[in-house]
Every structure is written in structure tokens, then in C-alpha cells.
């Protein structure tokens, strides 16, 4: 392989969830946003991106043009619907076959890089990269060993097959991309990744889509438009309804606040999202709300599109993220871009996404008592709230997709040069 030009065409693989899917339900989340926004930003810098994902409905077109230079290709691999993520490894041969068939219709050397997202995609990615004689760049997004070390009560551990699959992808990848220094350290210590091939590239945020309110009048007007009272404290949770994201912690903390301060006005907790993995998860969370006696203070909202999500974030006093783990936590950066501070668990990438006591607060554990105490301080200290609100937008402005794309393209280039040297 000889390198005479920057990577101008990238094959991105995203097997288990489409970048076009609505975040906040099923398996769709921050990774979906990451893939499509990174692709758009790289295309704006002159690199074409084709994203391969598994077809999940019969009426999905073969190809969708997302933006200039960005295509999503739907690959048939197994049943369209009703296939659990845990069953997807059995469909990887069909998915890989579909990816290779697309490239076979092109002139040789069509793609310069394969970039896979999540371990399932890495399994298909290393075969495609080997066939096309191009480097494989891989982003884990989440890792089984990390998740298993921080399981929520009653949550099932990730299977041994996934751990083995991740080890294989780490070994086969020419470059590994981590969201944070902490994730890079986990790749090295938990998966024996060569530090020389691990690169840290921070995700971004669309600062034009996620903006602060112009003034208090706009904030109050948006609250009314969303069915809220113009005054009063509002806490927003936005994410999939699953133990990993910890919405149960917020419900229990709210119940403690109510019992400890029965005469104080209660905040409204808005839970935005749908179930993931277990369809019963949403019903169980609703039942928990009633059992804890806080139903009148909790509002459930379906997964929201980007403009509506930005509205919810603008009207909130705080966005809360009691996740058991996050490789980064895009919701945190989106909220802060709206000028809303974040109260987050002190885990994973959230320690980078949130600047403690500057743009938000990091909570040391997942005990409802601890969260109730932090919420009590955060809601009761007006000076702290205003200070964090001022710092939130400043912190978010450090993260842009344009910067992410620039750094990622640099990783591609270094990886291609190294591969060229190694193969002579």
C-alpha cells in the first residue's frame, strides 16, 4: 500500500443501530448521533463517507443521502425486525457479505479507510479492511469489561463472547479511537491495546442546534409551550430507559427530597426516552414512580427530535445523568451548549464532559441519599446555579464536530502512513 493523498473516501460500519434512528429508544443513543455528525463534519472537509448499517424494516431504501458526501447504505442481514442485539453476531457473515458486495461493484481501491463503531462492526470491519487492503480504525463506544465492572442492580453482565470479540477487534485494528484519556487507559489496561495505536479524539456538539435561551422570557415561553409551569425547578433526564442510565436513582432521590422537605416546593422531573433491551423497563420505572409517591412530580416524555430536545434542555434548571457508565455522554455536552448545567455521576467520560463545579456537578456514587443531597444543594443555592449556568456554555464550546473531524482525519492519515511503511 502506498499513500499519496489524504483519505478521501471512508467506509463506516455501524451494524447494530442505524445512524438515522431516533436516539433515546431501542439501541439508538449517543453513538447514532456521533456517527452521523462525524460523517457530516468530515464530508464538509472534503472526505466522502458511506455508512453501512443493518436493514431493520422492509421499506428502508438501499441508499439514503444524509448530506452532501454522506450516504447511508442499508444491508440485508437476517430478519428485518424482532432481532435482539444479542442475536446479531449470528448475522455478521451476511452483513459482511453485503458490505463486500457493494465494494465489488466499484473500481479497485474505492475506500481508503474502514472505520467501525462498536465491537460487532469491528468484527465485520476487520474482514472488509483485510479484503480491501486498507487500515481498520475502530471506536469501541462501550466495552464489556467496563460495563461488567459497574453493573446496575439486577442488570445482566455482558457475555464472554462479546469480551472475546472485543479482544479480537483490538488486536486486528490498525488504530483505536477513544473518546477520553480515561477510555484510552481502559483499552490499554483491560484489553492490552498497544498505546501507540490508541488515539484520543473528543466528540463534539452542534452549537447552532443546541443554544441557550435568549432571556428568561424565552425560557418561560418555552416552558409553557412544553406544558410546564413558567416558574419552578425542572430537572431533565434524557436517555434510554435502562438500568445502565440510572433513571431509578433520580426517582428514589426525588422521593427522599419529598420526605426530607415536605413543606418545600418539589422540582419537576422530566424523563425523556424509551425502553432499551427490555420493553418492560418503561412500565417498571412508571411503577416505581407511583410506589415512591412522586407521580405528581414526574413527567414521562417520548424520545424527542433534536429541536425539541434542545427546548427541553433550555427550560431545565439542571440535566441529570446518573449513568453507571458512559464512554463520553453526548447529552451532557448538548445540555451545557444550551447553557444548562449537568449533574452527573462521576464515571467514565462524564468526568471529561462535565467540568466539576464549573459547568456542573459530579456525584461520587449512585446512592439515592447522595443524589438527594446534591440536588438539594444545587436547587437551593441560587448563586451556584447561576455560576454553573454561565460556565456550561463556555465548557461546551470546546467541543465541536469540526474539531472532531479534523482530529479524526489526522488519525486516518497517520494510520495510512504507518500501514504504508509496514507493508513497504
From Swiss-Prot:
One MF term in the entry's GO annotations: D-inositol-3-phosphate glycosyltransferase activity
Binding site for 1D-myo-inositol 3-phosphate: 16, 27-32, 85, 118, 142, 162
Magnesium listed as a keyword: yes
InterPro entries, alphabetized: Glyco_trans_1 (IPR001296), Glyco_trans_4-like_N (IPR028098), Glycosyltransferase_grp1 (IPR050194), Mycothiol_biosynthesis_MshA (IPR017814)
Highest taxon, organism lineage: Bacteria
Swiss-Prot/TrEMBL keywords: Glycosyltransferase, Magnesium, Metal-binding, Transferase
Enzyme Commission (EC) number: 2.4.1.250
Residues binding Mg(2+): 313-314, 316, 340
SUPFAM superfamilies reported in the protein's UniProt record: UDP-Glycosyltransferase/glycogen phosphorylase (SSF53756)
Catalysed reactions listed for this entry: 1D-myo-inositol 3-phosphate + UDP-N-acetyl-alpha-D-glucosamine = 1D-myo-inositol 2-acetamido-2-deoxy-alpha-D-glucopyranoside 3-phosphate + UDP + H(+)
List of residues binding UDP-N-acetyl-alpha-D-glucosamine: 22-23, 30, 240, 245, 326, 334
Keyword tRNA-binding listed: no
Entry's Gene Ontology BP terms: mycothiol biosynthetic process
Assembly description: Homodimer.
Family affiliation: Belongs to the glycosyltransferase group 1 family. MshA subfamily.
Free-text function comment from the UniProt entry: Catalyzes the transfer of a N-acetyl-glucosamine moiety to 1D-myo-inositol 3-phosphate to produce 1D-myo-inositol 2-acetamido-2-deoxy-glucopyranoside 3-phosphate in the mycothiol biosynthesis pathway.
Identification of the protein by name: D-inositol 3-phosphate glycosyltransferase
The organism of origin for this protein: Jonesia denitrificans (strain ATCC 14870 / DSM 20603 / BCRC 15368 / CIP 55.134 / JCM 11481 / NBRC 15587 / NCTC 10816 / Prevot 55134) (Listeria denitrificans)
Lineage: Bacteria, Bacillati, Actinomycetota, Actinomycetes, Micrococcales
Amino acid at each position: 500500500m502506498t499513500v499519496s493523498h489524504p483519505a478521501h473516501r471512508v467506509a463506516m460500519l455501524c451494524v447494530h443501530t442505524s445512524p438515522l434512528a431516533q436516539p433515546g429508544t431501542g439501541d439508538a443513543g449517543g453513538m447514532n448521533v456521533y456517527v452521523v455528525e462525524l460523517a457530516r463534519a468530515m464530508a464538509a472537509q472534503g472526505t466522502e463517507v458511506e455508512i453501512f448499517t443493518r436493514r431493520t424494516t422492509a421499506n428502508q431504501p438501499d441508499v439514503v443521502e444524509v448530506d452532501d458526501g454522506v450516504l447511508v447504505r442499508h444491508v440485508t442481514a437476517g430478519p428485518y425486525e424482532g432481532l435482539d442485539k444479542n442475536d446479531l453476531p449470528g448475522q455478521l457473515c451476511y452483513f459482511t457479505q453485503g458490505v463486500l458486495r457493494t465494494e465489488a461493484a466499484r473500481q479497485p481501491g474505492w475506500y481508503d479507510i474502514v472505520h467501525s463503531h462498536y465491537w460487532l462492526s469491528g468484527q465485520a470491519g476487520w474482514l472488509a479492511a483485510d479484503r480491501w487492503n486498507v487500515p481498520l480504525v475502530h471506536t469501541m463506544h462501550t466495552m464489556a469489561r467496563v460495563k461488567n465492572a459497574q453493573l446496575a442492580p439486577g442488570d445482566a453482565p455482558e457475555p464472554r463472547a462479546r469480551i472475546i470479540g472485543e479482544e479480537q477487534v483490538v488486536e486486528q485494528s490498525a488504530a483505536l479511537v477513544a473518546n477520553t484519556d480515561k477510555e484510552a487507559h481502559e483499552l490499554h489496561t483491560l484489553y492490552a491495546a498497544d498505546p501507540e495505536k490508541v488515539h484520543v479524539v473528543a466528540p463534539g456538539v452542534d452549537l447552532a442546534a443546541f443554544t441557550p435561551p435568549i432571556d428568561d422570557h424565552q425560557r418561560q415561553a418555552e416552558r409553557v409551550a412544553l406544558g410546564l409551569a413558567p416558574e419552578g425547578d425542572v430537572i431533565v433526564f434524557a436517555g434510554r430507559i435502562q438500568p445502565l442510565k440510572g433513571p431509578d436513582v433520580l426517582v428514589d432521590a426525588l422521593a427522599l427530597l419529598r420526605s426530607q422537605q415536605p413543606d418545600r416546593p418539589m422540582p419537576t422531573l422530566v424523563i425523556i426516552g424509551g425502553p432499551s433491551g427490555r420493553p418492560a423497563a418503561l412500565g417498571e420505572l412508571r411503577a416505581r414512580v407511583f410506589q415512591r409517591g412522586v407521580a405528581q412530580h414526574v413527567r414521562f416524555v417520548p424520545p424527542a427530535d433534536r429541536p425539541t430536545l434542545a427546548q427541553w434542555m433550555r427550560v431545565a434548571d439542571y440535566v441529570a445523568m446518573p449513568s453507571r457508565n458512559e464512554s463520553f455522554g453526548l447529552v451532557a455536552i448538548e445540555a451545557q451548549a444550551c447553557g444548562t448545567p449537568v449533574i452527573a455521576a462521576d464515571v467514565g467520560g462524564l468526568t471529561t464532559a462535565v467540568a466539576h463545579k464549573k459547568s456542573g456537578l459530579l456525584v461520587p456514587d449512585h446512592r439515592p441519599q447522595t443524589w438527594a443531597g446534591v440536588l438539594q444543594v444545587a436547587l437551593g443555592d441560587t448563586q451556584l446555579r447561576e455560576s454553573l449556568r454561565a460556565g456550561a456554555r463556555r465548557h461546551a464550546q470546546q467541543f465541536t464536530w469540526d474539531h472532531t473531524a479534523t482530529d479524526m482525519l489526522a488519525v486516518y492519515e497517520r494510520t495510512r502512513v504507518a500501514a504504508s511503511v509496514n507493508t513497504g
